C-alpha cells in the first residue's frame, strides 16, 4: 500500500524581541497552574520577564531547575511534581535537553506543553519527539509523540545574549535538514512520522538551507554583539522552526546515526550538534 503523505507542526509559534513579556497573554488559554522546567541559564535569563508577564494574575507557577540531561530518572522526578502540584501546563525553559525532558513529562502526564528555547542550538523545540538518555548520558531511545508541542515561544533578545557557539551549533544541526531529507526522498524512505514525504516538508527543509546560506554570517556577527537584527531573527527561525518542522516531515539520515553512536564513547561535554556536524 502506498504511504499516506502527512504534515505536522507546533500548534502555535511566537518569535520576536520581548516575546517573554507576552507569555501569559499568548498562552493563558491553556491553564492556570504552570510548571517551568528550567536549565540554570534558562531560569536566570527568563524568570524575571516571565514573572512580569503574570503581573496581576493569580496563576500558580513553579520553577524547577532541570538536572542536566533528559534522562529517565529526571523525567520521573518532573512527573511527580506535575502530579503533586496539580499542574495544567508544562513549560520547558532552556536548551535541547530541558526541552526533551519537559516534552516527555507532559506526554506521560497528559498535559499541555509549551517550549521556550533559550539557545538556538537545536531544532528540538518544534519537533514531535524527544531524545531520551540513560542516567550515565548514553543514548537510550527516541520517544515519538502523537503531536508536536502546543506552542513554542522564542524571545530573540534571549538568543542574542546567549554564547555564539550555541547559534553556530544550531546552524550546523539545521544544515543537514535538507540534505538528510533529500536522501530520504531519493531512497523512498518514510518521514519521521512513518508517512510519505510531502512537497511542503521538502520546501521547508530547502528554505532552511537557503536561509542559513543567506543570513548565517550576519547572524553570527549580531549574536557576537548581543543585538537582534533581521538576519539573526531569520537564522533563529531557520534553526528552531524551519529545521524542526522540516526534519519532522522529512527524515534523518547518516549524521544522526553517527551522533547516536558517538554518545556511547563519552565526551558528553561537547555540544550535541558539534558531533552531528562532523558526520556532514
Mark where each language-model region is.
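Short glycine/serine/threonine-rich phosphate/pyrophosphate-binding segments
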Residues: 20, 43-47, 72, 97-104, ...
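Active-site segments that bind and position negatively charged phosphate/pyrophosphate groups
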Residues: 192-280
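Short, well-ordered alpha-helices that flank and scaffold nucleotide-derived cofactor binding pockets
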Residues: 25, 52, 80, 104-107, ...
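A short, small-residue-rich loop immediately preceding and capping a beta-strand
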Residues: 82-105, 109-118
Amino acid at each position: 500500500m502506498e504511504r499516506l503523505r502527512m504534515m505536522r507542526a507546533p500548534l502555535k509559534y511566537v518569535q520576536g524581541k520581548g516575546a517573554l513579556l507576552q507569555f501569559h497573554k499568548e498562552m493563558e488559554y491553556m491553564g492556570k497552574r504552570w510548571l517551568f522546567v528550567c536549565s540554570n541559564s534558562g531560569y536566570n535569563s527568563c524568570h524575571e520577564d516571565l514573572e512580569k508577564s503574570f503581573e496581576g494574575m493569580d496563576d500558580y507557577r513553579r520553577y524547577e531547575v532541570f538536572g542536566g540531561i533528559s534522562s529517565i530518572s529526571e523525567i520521573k522526578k518532573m512527573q511527580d511534581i506535575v502530579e503533586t502540584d496539580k499542574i495544567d501546563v508544562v513549560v520547558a525553559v532552556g536548551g535541547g535537553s530541558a526541552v526533551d525532558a519537559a516534552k516527555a513529562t507532559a506526554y506521560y502526564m497528559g498535559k499541555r506543553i509549551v517550549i521556550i528555547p533559550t539557545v538556538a542550538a537545536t531544532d528540538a523545540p518544534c519537533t514531535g519527539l524527544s531524545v531520551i538518555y540513560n542516567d550515565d548520558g548514553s543514548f537510550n531511545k527516541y520517544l515519538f509523540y502523537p503531536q508536536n508541542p502546543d506552542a513554542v515561544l522564542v524571545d530573540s533578545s534571549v538568543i542574542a545574549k546567549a554564547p555564539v557557539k550555541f547559534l553556530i551549533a544550531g546552524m550546523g544541526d539545521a544544515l543537514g535538514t535538507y540534505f538528510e531529507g533529500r536522501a530520504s526522498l531519493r531512497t523512498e524512505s518514510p518521514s519521521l512520522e512513518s508517512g510519505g514525504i510531502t512537497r511542503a516538508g521538502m520546501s521547508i527543509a530547502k528554505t532552511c538551507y537557503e536561509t542559513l546560506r543567506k543570513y548565517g554570517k550576519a547572524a553570527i556577527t549580531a549574536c557576537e554583539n548581543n543585538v537582534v537584527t533581521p538576519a539573526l531573527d531569520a537564522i533563529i527561525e531557520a534553526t528552531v522552526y524551519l529545521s524542526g518542522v522540516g526534519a519532522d516531515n522529512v527524515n534523518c539520515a547518516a549524521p544522526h546515526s553517527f551522533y547516536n553512536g558517538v554518545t556511547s564513547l563519552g565526551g558528553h561535554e561537547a555540544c550535541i550538534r558539534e558531533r552531528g556536524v562532523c558526520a556532514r
